[in-house]
Amino acid sequence: MSCTIEKILTDAKTLLERLREHDAAAESLVDQSAALHRRVAAMREAGTALPDQYQEDASDIKDMSKYKPHILLSQENTQIRDLQQENRELWVSLEEHQDALELIMSKYRKQMLQLMVAKKAADAEPVLKAHQSHSAEIENQIDRICEMGEVMRKAVQMDDDQFCKIQEKLAQLELENKELRELLSISSESLQVRKESSVDTASQGIK
């Protein structure tokens, strides 16, 4: 592709140089035509100002000046038309080369874009794999954290349940202890009353 682009650029450069040469040649012909017109005008003025002895020579010069510039101008006009036609053909050829160059550059840009996209994809593949691996690791860590959280929640719930059971047991033990103390107190009072009654009975029997 590079060779084709270089060839097109070289051809385009050559065409532009030829166009410049033709423009310069056309300008030179126009200048020559203007110079011939000035010479003819000067010869005519000189012919009208010559003395009588030079009138015949002057008329011959006038005839020659009329004839020669006409031929020269005709030839120059033909050359100018040929140059203009060649210039038009060169411009058409240059435009065709430009169109071909634009088409090639368009395809080249498209291919480069595809290569860049492929390169970016290739460059991004390791990063993507690392990202996927890292994401999988993070997901595993999140799963482990969730599992640990569930275990902790269950443990806390079990601790709460155990605490509640212990609290209930303590309350029950306190209640039973209180009841036992009351029973012991009642028993102690009953024994004391019985003891006192026995003492009183024994005292009365002695009397």
Swiss-Prot record:
Interacts with IKBKE and TBK1 via its coiled coil region. Interaction with TBK1 is disrupted upon viral infection or TLR3 stimulation. Interacts with CDC42BPB. Interacts with SIKE1 which mediates association with the STRIPAK core complex composed of PP2A catalytic and scaffolding subunits, the striatins (PP2A regulatory subunits), the striatin-associated proteins MOB4, STRIP1 and STRIP2, PDCD10 and members of the STE20 kinases, such as STK24 and STK26. Residues 70-102, 162-192 form a coiled coil. It is found in: Cytoplasm. This is Suppressor of IKBKE 1. Physiological suppressor of IKK-epsilon and TBK1 that plays an inhibitory role in virus- and TLR3-triggered IRF3. Inhibits TLR3-mediated activation of interferon-stimulated response elements (ISRE) and the IFN-beta promoter. May act by disrupting the interactions of IKBKE or TBK1 with TICAM1/TRIF, IRF3 and RIGI. Does not inhibit NF-kappa-B activation pathways. Associates with the striatin-interacting phosphatase and kinase (STRIPAK) core complex, forming the extended (SIKE1:SLMAP)STRIPAK complex. It holds the Pfam family SIKE. The keyword Cytoplasm applies. One of its GO terms (molecular function) is protein-macromolecule adaptor activity. Its main location: cytoplasm. It comes from Bos taurus (Bovine). GO terms for biological process: negative regulation of hippo signaling. InterPro entries: SIKE. Keywords: Coiled coil, Cytoplasm. It comes from the Eukaryota. Belongs to the SIKE family. PANTHER family: SIKE FAMILY MEMBER, SUPPRESSOR OF IKBKE 1. GO terms for cellular component: cytoplasm; FAR/SIN/STRIPAK complex.
